[in-house]
Amino acid sequence: MSQFLADLRAKNPLVHCITNYVAMNISANVVLAAGASPAMIHTPEETADFAKIVGALTVNIGTLSPSWVKGMKLAAEAANEAAVPWVFDPVAHFATPYRAQAAQELLALNPTILRGNASEIMGLGGQASEAKGVDATDPVEAAEAGAMMLAKKYGSVVVITGETDFVTDGSRVARVSGGSEIMPMITALGCSLTCLMGGFAAIAPPMEAAATALALFAEAGVQAEKQATGPGSFQPHFLDALHNTTPETLEKAGRITWQ
């Protein structure tokens, strides 16, 4: 799996990140630090054209408007037509009817990778959840059956992020451990993971791309925590750790368990 990190840095794929206002800066910096190249384009007048020429597309519904939803759908449709992999992050899709409808319309376009927290994945799978905002209130284990179902239904690799991340294509399963308790204290850090996952999806098969992105993220979190004194100092140390983690270090960390 560590070879994919070397490939990412050698190929420096262009990642089309349609993400929310809160996440744009940190997402672009995370993608750059890891070794890929971000483009933060969301207007519907150009999303379809751009999605056809990139290595991967990522779509995050954190901040929505009719224009943004149109741009997201056009980009996803264009990516499918051009065989460009795309990652969907259905942020708090259960919060409002408008958000829920947008999420279902995008999910129907069969994302290559679907990434969410346990509450988001449970909701998309039709399971009851206690979540009320963007943060998960359900354990990863509660969403695993729903993730398997969604993977089979939409032909997607489904990722549940949490204390131990869960990845499935409907038959295979991988779990990724690591990270830091400080990570949830930094706004939009999870959103940036979606963009990073797009970088790996541009150069690796979807299941392996998702697992490698999670492993790099987790390892960087572990390393950043060793030097940080709180959320403020954690963020720059995290970016440095993404940049400085080598394929050999990632391999030695052994953060991925395949089942």
Name the predicted role of every residue range.
Residues 98-173:
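Conserved phosphate/ATP/ADP-binding segment of small-molecule kinases
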